[in-house]
């Protein structure tokens, strides 16, 4: 097995900084690749949380000027992660999230903040750190999308590139007037380069200029080649279909393990499912729900947004209430949705509980205590919460889209008869169909044998990174072999 060295480029990484699933992927993939002969380091921005969380740091390069100020590249570690951290206080030392300020508005200099990340990645790929020259650069989402552009237009030898789309809805578009300031030549602003409807498209750059494209589920790879999910980039994705692959995400099964999870009230496994009820009791107490052990407890852990379909849950509340289902919702996002869910909790105390925000400990407890977990997304590239739900014995109730349809086997008659069902799917993604799915879920819950079969199938499914990592390693090697073949032809 030929050894491969790879640089991952990501705007967030668990456990240092996380706003979504990208962080989980960036944090788990390096360790998963090691058994497949791939050594990966990850380049991340030096946000305050990152600099505070790393365990060691040694400067390996200094930039006198990087988009408005001096910067340093640090070699660092966090647990088992080998990192490069771009320390640029003028770009990253500020409050708020990685992408927006405390007021929720995008940082006005995001074009430079993430161009700096991409340019540094490209320079590492071309020998900036002599002790680490990667064979592959694997860039994630629009924040790293300029990486192949900086490589392509440098005129220098370059490593192979892979670009992964985690969510096509966020594309990183900026004024064309920034082209020269970003250090890109005039020729880069073309339909075959970074130009996208008159702007500079960071996502478009990654899709256009990388050697291979992946996205986080086979179904989403197909969906984004059509106009509904393609978000204006479907034509390009159809054009590059031969270079596009869908590889499912996994979850870190050491972090997400109900038998060892220190964040939950009681640990359990498939042979000791009765211990799970202590977690259900804790969720009910925390969300001020009535302590009725016979009621179905439905969990939601989600950003409150149109994409995530949480407005559809509000439409389906009459059915949820009539079925006697309890709801424990943890999430934040759209202020209107937040207020509507808080109002529902006030109107139906004991049956609906809502906590606005996000808390990792509570997310683990909901997975361990909810009977079912709802993911009603209008589109979902992969989704991780349903994978965690499978692992924890919370039966997933999901919209039949993207990675949700790839990872949850609907409890229809054929799947139940074959003994392979793991959850409930619904389609089309409407309030009425969600309501019907809730009624179906309640009926399944009433059949204890059927419900336990769903839990058993979910908890025995392999949702780890083992298979995805093997697919990525194969992709890297096939790409390097193709390059070698062209070089010797």
Swiss-Prot record:
Pfam families cross-referenced by the UniProt entry: Glyco_transf_5, Glycos_transf_1
GO MF annotations in UniProt: alpha-1,4-glucan glucosyltransferase (ADP-glucose donor) activity; alpha-1,4-glucan glucosyltransferase (UDP-glucose donor) activity
Protein's UniProt keywords contain Transferase: yes
Top-rank EC class of the record's enzyme: transferase
Pathway entry: Glycan biosynthesis; glycogen biosynthesis
GO biological process: glycogen biosynthetic process
Assigned EC number: 2.4.1.21
Protein family according to the UniProt entry: Belongs to the glycosyltransferase 1 family. Bacterial/plant glycogen synthase subfamily.
Name of the protein described by the UniProt record: Glycogen synthase
Organism: Rhodopseudomonas palustris (strain BisB18)
């Amino acid at each position: 097995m030929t050894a491969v060295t790879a640089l991952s480029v990501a705007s967030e990484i668990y456990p240092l900084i996380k706003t979504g699933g990208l962080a989980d992927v960036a944090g788990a993939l390096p360790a998963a690749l090691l058994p497949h002969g791939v050594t990966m380091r990850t380049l991340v921005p030096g946000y305050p949380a990152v600099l505070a969380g790393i365990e060691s740091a040694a400067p390996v390069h200094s930039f006198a000027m990087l988009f408005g100020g001096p910067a340093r590249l640090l070699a660092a570690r966090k647990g088992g992660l080998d990192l490069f951290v771009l320390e640029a206080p003028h770009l990253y030392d500020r409050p708020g999230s990685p992408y927006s300020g405390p007021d929720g508005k995008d940082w006005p200099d995001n074009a430079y903040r993430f161009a700096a990340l991409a340019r540094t990645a490209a320079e590492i790929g071309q020998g900036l750190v002599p002790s680490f020259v990667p064979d592959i650069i694997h860039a994630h989402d629009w924040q790293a999308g300029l990486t192949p552009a900086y490589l392509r237009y440098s005129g220098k030898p370059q490593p192979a590139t892979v670009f992964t789309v985690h969510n096509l809805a966020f594309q990183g578009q900026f004024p064309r007037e920034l082209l020269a300031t970003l250090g890109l030549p005039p020729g880069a602003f073309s339909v075959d380069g970074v130009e996208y409807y008159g702007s500079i498209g960071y996502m478009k750059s990654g899709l256009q200029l990388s050697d291979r494209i992946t996205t986080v589920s086979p179904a989403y790879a197909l969906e984004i080649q059509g106009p509904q999910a393609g978000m204006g980039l479907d034509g390009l994705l159809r054009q590059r279909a031969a270079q596009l692959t869908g590889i499912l995400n996994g979850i870190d099964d050491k972090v997400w393990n109900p038998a060892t999870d220190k964040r939950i009230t009681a640990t359990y496994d498939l042979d000791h499912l009765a211990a799970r009820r202590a977690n259900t009791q804790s969720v009910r107490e925390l969300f001020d729900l009535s302590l009725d052990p016979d009621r179905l407890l439905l969990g939601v852990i989600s950003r409150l947004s149109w994409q995530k379909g949480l407005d559809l849950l509000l439409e389906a509340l009459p059915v949820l209430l009539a079925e006697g289902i309890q709801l424990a919702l943890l999430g934040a996002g759209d202020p209107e949705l937040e207020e509507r869910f808080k109002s529902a909790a006030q109107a139906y105390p004991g049956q609906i509980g809502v906590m606005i925000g996000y808390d990792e400990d509570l997310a683990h407890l909901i997975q361990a205590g909810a009977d079912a977990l709802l993911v009603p997304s209008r589109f979902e590239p992969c989704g991780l919460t349903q994978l965690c739900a499978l692992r924890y014995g919370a039966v997933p109730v999901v919209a039949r889209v993207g990675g949700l349809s790839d990872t949850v086997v609907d409890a229809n008659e054929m799947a139940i008869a074959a003994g392979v069902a793991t959850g409930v799917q619904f389609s089309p993604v409407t309030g009425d169909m969600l309501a019907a799915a809730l009624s179906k879920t309640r009926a399944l819950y009433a059949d204890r044998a059927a419900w336990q079969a769903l839990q058993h199938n979910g908890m025995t499914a392999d949702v780890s990174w083992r298979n995805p990592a093997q697919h990525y390693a194969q992709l890297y090697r096939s790409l390097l072999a193709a390059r070698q073949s062209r070089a010797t032809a």
